[in-house]
Each structure stands twice: as structure tokens, then as C-alpha cells.
Amino acid sequence: MEALKKIAGVTAAQYVTDGMTIGLGTGSTAYYFVEEIGRRVKQEGLQVVGVTTSSVTSKQAEVLGIPLKSIDDIDSIDLTVDGADEVDKDFNGIKGGGAALLMEKIVATPTKEYIWVVDASKMVEHLGAFKLPVEVVQYGADRLFRVFEKAGYKPSFRMKGDSRLVTDMQNYIIDLDLGCIKDPVAFGHLLDGTVGVVEHGLFNGMVDKVIVASKDGVTVLEAPKAG
């Protein structure tokens, strides 16, 4: 599995060229993309500026010598490469297994080309077998938990040891065990309109390419262009 993740990450790095501003994703597959960019910066003199999606990725990039800028200091990003926890046939996805979904979505939004790197096990018919992360403000989180419970969403707080995990943005994550999300777009809109929800892990209609690594090789899937 790790070998497939590495292949996907290294393949994505081939899309990066001199002078780009690139979004550096978070997670076990995006890790290999960042490592390969670091190698190219050091060995090939690749000139890029990175924008990171988590404190973990920031530390990784700094160790590798990748120059970084804050999202607040840029207007657009040429290319962002990130992982995904599930991707369906309509190129909607669930992200946030690494608890970085808010920053990941903020970085993805001004990106000209958004690429996900996954192994073949992440490609699914319907989203929802992977629990859907919902980032919520700490104030009122228990009330919101009960709202989700009454709706039948089987919520659970993301934990770190014996305590609730706190994200880089100082929020909690409630994971929803939905089983199957029949209409990800509609459910995303529902969560968008829920007071106390900061962001959710449904990334609908955002990705441009999905690089899938399997035992048979690497496949690059192109999402249909809107309009």
C-alpha cells in the first residue's frame, strides 16, 4: 500500500514546473508528493513556492527546504496536490481523515488545477463508508452533536488520546457514520447551512485530476469540465 501511495505522489510531482506556486496537501499520500518536491528543489534546483494545508505539512516542507508563503500573501495557486479518503464516480470526494479539511479547502479554492493522489482502494461507487468529518466550533459542539444524533448521522467526536482532538484552527471534528451518501451535493449544502459547522469534508466538483495507483500501474482520471 505504501508503495502505491509513493507512486501516486511522485507521479503528481511531474506536473510541477519552475515558477509555480503550489498547494502542498496533507496525509499519507500527499506526504510523498511533498517529499518528491523537496528532492527536486534540492537536486534539480526547482524554483517553486509552497502553500501548506496543515502544521504537519509546514514542518515537512521546512525540513525539505521548500520555500513557503502564507495563503494570505497569494492571490492564486497554480497547482495543488492532496490526498482523498474516498472518491466517487462523479469526482466528488471525502477528505479530512488527517483533520486538515478546513485548511485543505481554503487552499483548494484559489487553485487553478487541483489534483488528488490516491491508491485504488479509495475509488468507490458511493461516498459514505468512510466517516464524514465535520469541523465545528467548540462553543455549542455538544448541542450540535445531539442534533446530528437525532438526525440519525451516528456522530462521534474525533479523539486524540483521552481528549477531543483540536484542529490547527482550534475547532473540534465530529465524524458522521453515514454508510452511504446518496446525494453528496445536497448533503454538503445542508451542512453548509448548519450554524456551528465551520466546514465539512465533502469536496464536491472541485478536483480536476485524480491520480490512482494500483498494482497494475498509474491511471490519471480527468474530471469533466463544468459547463
Swiss-Prot record:
HAMAP family: Rib_5P_isom_A (MF_00170). One of its GO terms (molecular function) is ribose-5-phosphate isomerase activity. This is Ribose-5-phosphate isomerase A. Belongs to the ribose 5-phosphate isomerase family. PANTHER family: RIBOSE-5-PHOSPHATE ISOMERASE 3, CHLOROPLASTIC-RELATED. Homodimer. Catalyzes the reversible conversion of ribose-5-phosphate to ribulose 5-phosphate. GO terms for biological process: pentose-phosphate shunt, non-oxidative branch. Its EC number is 5.3.1.6. The active site is at E104. Keywords: Isomerase.
